[in-house]
């Protein structure tokens, strides 16, 4: 956690509200500790914090949602009951997709594999949430643009 704290301190110190830094965070069994550090260092205020493949408790999920964190989901996450439930519960405005490719270090993958994985993820999330896949795709594209281009409010 020492390295994570140092990264968060540097990110918060150098982040510009007009073009905030984006932190992609994988919190394996440490969501509350990570949220504490993000809060203490100012990252929650000065950066865009994205939880990659979030698997913490429902209380931790609620805390991260309330802190305006973003969440990226992938097709592997959606294979678990918890992953599907979180994909259903997350506010649409804080939802992103990801691939988590390649599946193993050194394993080849292609742009087509990435596109297919994203399409499967969008289809699965649309089914879970009973949404039109095309409308969800548009919302996710809007979210990605906002994540990468909007100033902090």
Q: Which residues does each predicted region cover?
A:
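Catalytic pocket-lining loop regions of alpha/beta-barrel enzymes
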Residues: 1-96
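Alpha-helix N-cap and loop-to-helix initiation/capping positions
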Residues: 2-3, 109-117
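Mid-to-C-terminal alpha-helical segments outside catalytic/metal-binding sites
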Residues: 14, 18, 115-153
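Ser/Thr-centric signal marking residues that sit
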Residues: 27, 99, 121
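Surface-exposed loop/turn and secondary-structure junction residues enriched for glycine/proline
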Residues: 57, 79-81, 104-107, 151
């Amino acid at each position: 956690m020492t390295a994570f704290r140092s990264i968060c301190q540097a990110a918060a110190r150098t982040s510009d509200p007009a073009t905030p830094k984006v932190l992609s965070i994988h919190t394996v069994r440490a969501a509350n500790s990570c949220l504490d550090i993000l809060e203490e260092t100012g990252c929650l205020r000065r950066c865009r914090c994205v939880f990659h493949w979030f698997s913490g408790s429902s209380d931790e999920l609620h805390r991260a949602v309330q802190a305006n964190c973003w969440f990226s989901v992938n097709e592997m996450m959606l294979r678990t009951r918890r992953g599907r439930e979180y994909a259903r519960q997350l506010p649409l405005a804080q939802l992103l997709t990801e691939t988590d490719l390649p599946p193993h270090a050194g394993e080849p993958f292609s742009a087509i594999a990435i596109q297919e994985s994203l399409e499967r993820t969008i289809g699965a999330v649309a089914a879970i949430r009973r949404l039109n896949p095309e409308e969800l795709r548009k919302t996710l594209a809007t979210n990605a643009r906002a994540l990468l281009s909007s100033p902090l409010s």
